[in-house]
Amino acid sequence: MADWQKAHGRLQRDVAGNRTVPYAGADAMTRPRQAQSPLSAADKAAALALTPVSRETEARLDAYVDLLVQWQTKTNLIASSTLPQLWTRHIADSLQLLALAPQAKRWADFGSGGGFPGVVLACALADVEGARIDLVERNAKKAAFLREAVRITGTPGVIHPMDIGDYVDRLDGRIDCVTARALAPLQVLLGFAEPLVKQGAKALLLKGQDVEAELTEATKYWNIEPRLHSSRTGGQGWIVELDRIERRDRPPTKQAWRRA
């Protein structure tokens, strides 16, 4: 049994916040009702306790989160059911990657979607000289959201509205760390990450409860020495850390995979 299989297990942690709203009186029935925020202050506090950030970074994250909630009403950026746990489930889940690559300045985030982890990392690294986060997203609406998120937060994110393969082929310069979250099967992700890892990048790939099955399948096509990190946010999340990716005889074709 491989080391990563021995290390595989589950962490469960529930983070919830409850709030009591006082009765406002009968005349409140006639007043326009303001939309209630789907976010939880307790969830934010729990996330920042897990992954502390500076006040400047927190302010940038607040601006990003507000924008995401606005856009979520018209563009499906994340599962709406996860909004009450947005800070722990998405923000903290992204921030924890920084501890695994503390010296990395140039990042490439494949399939950035709603900005996890790419925009979150950009918010955290905005004050680091020379930092740059490439956000690769071919969906036009999501790329437009990412562009606006980078603009209002003033972060060092660069939007690449193209397929991942095209980005890798055109890449100029060295990447320190490549990331992907909720994107594609591991054996496919390795094909995209391989050229960057061969040039010295570290791969940090966020996976869910099926990580063991994905690793088993991936090792049919790739020689890898993965290190598994259970998510600091609890639940069934895992981070697959890789410093080496080598092809076997029959790697899966990237063309066989199409992102929804």
From Swiss-Prot:
<protein>
    <recommendedName>
        <fullName>Ribosomal RNA small subunit methyltransferase G</fullName>
        <ecNumber>2.1.1.170</ecNumber>
    </recommendedName>
</protein>
<keyword id="KW-0963">Cytoplasm</keyword>
<dbReference type="InterPro" id="IPR029063">
    <property type="entry name" value="SAM-dependent_MTases_sf"/>
</dbReference>
<dbReference type="Pfam" id="PF02527">
    <property type="entry name" value="GidB"/>
</dbReference>
<feature type="binding site">
    <location>
        <position position="111"/>
    </location>
    <ligand>
        <name>S-adenosyl-L-methionine</name>
    </ligand>
</feature>
<feature type="binding site">
    <location>
        <position position="181"/>
    </location>
    <ligand>
        <name>S-adenosyl-L-methionine</name>
    </ligand>
</feature>
<keyword id="KW-0808">Transferase</keyword>
<keyword id="KW-0489">Methyltransferase</keyword>
<comment type="similarity">
    <text>Belongs to the methyltransferase superfamily. RNA methyltransferase RsmG family.</text>
</comment>
<feature type="binding site">
    <location>
        <position position="116"/>
    </location>
    <ligand>
        <name>S-adenosyl-L-methionine</name>
    </ligand>
</feature>
<keyword id="KW-0949">S-adenosyl-L-methionine</keyword>
<dbReference type="GO" id="GO:0005829">
    <property type="term" value="C:cytosol"/>
</dbReference>
<keyword id="KW-0698">rRNA processing</keyword>
<dbReference type="GO" id="GO:0070043">
    <property type="term" value="F:rRNA (guanine-N7-)-methyltransferase activity"/>
</dbReference>
<dbReference type="InterPro" id="IPR003682">
    <property type="entry name" value="rRNA_ssu_MeTfrase_G"/>
</dbReference>
<comment type="function">
    <text>Specifically methylates the N7 position of guanine in position 527 of 16S rRNA.</text>
</comment>
